[in-house]
């Protein structure tokens, strides 16, 4: 049997403003009765006050270093300058005290119990709406590994991201026998009026 205490939903807050979204993620998971731990990664620029508020709703608040794609040209073209620090989610692979994690962006809203995502294999993700050959890293099933973390960092430093997000940063699995490079998830994607993406999981 699977030890559910060794599995976690993970989100991330790189600013005080993102703490509000992360809190909404945690509350929506608890509202629908998740049996897994709920973890938030925060960067040093998140204030102590915000971190204390996160401890009220999360099981763990983990401090990580800020990574930045520094791809200002593509970020400007996409009109998404806030995406620069999204490489920070690569630190999910350092959470090796968990056997499996499901990463949810801070703009994700859970609308039912989604614990079944832990039955999925690494690397499960949804196709990116704008780039179907790549995956969108807003909802991602992964197995923490220090070695994978090292490889992802090396890949990010060497290749960066063609759109400023991590969707293209992770080296995709080799495709063999006609198989997918990654396991596809289905979820509804609805842009907010502000043009920021939000992921609604049914």
Language model segments and positions:
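Short amphipathic alpha-helical segments and helix-helix/interface helices
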Residues: 26, 48-52, 90, 111-115, ...
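Glycine-rich, phosphate-binding/catalytic loops in enzymes
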Residues: 28, 118-122, 158
């Amino acid at each position: 049997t699977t030890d559910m205490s060794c599995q976690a939903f993970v989100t991330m807050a790189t600013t005080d403003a993102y703490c509000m979204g992360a809190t909404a993620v945690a509350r929506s998971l608890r509202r629908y009765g998740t049996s897994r731990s709920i973890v938030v990664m925060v960067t040093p620029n998140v204030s102590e006050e915000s971190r204390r508020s996160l401890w009220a709703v999360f099981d763990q608040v983990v401090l990580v270093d800020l990574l930045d794609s520094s791809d200002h040209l593509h970020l400007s073209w996409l009109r998404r300058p806030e995406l620069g620090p999204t490489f920070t989610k690569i630190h999910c692979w350092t959470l090796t005290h968990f056997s499996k994690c499901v990463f949810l962006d801070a703009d994700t809203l859970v609308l039912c119990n989604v614990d079944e995502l832990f039955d999925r294999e690494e690397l499960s993700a949804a196709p990116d709406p704008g780039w179907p050959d790549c995956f969108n890293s807003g909802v991602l099933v992964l197995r923490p590994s220090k070695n994978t973390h090292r490889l992802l960092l090396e890949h990010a430093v060497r290749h960066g991201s063609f759109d400023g997000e991590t969707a293209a940063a992770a080296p995709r699995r080799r495709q063999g026998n006609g198989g997918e490079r990654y396991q596809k998830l289905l979820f509804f994607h609805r842009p907010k009026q502000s043009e920021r993406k939000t992921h609604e999981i049914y």
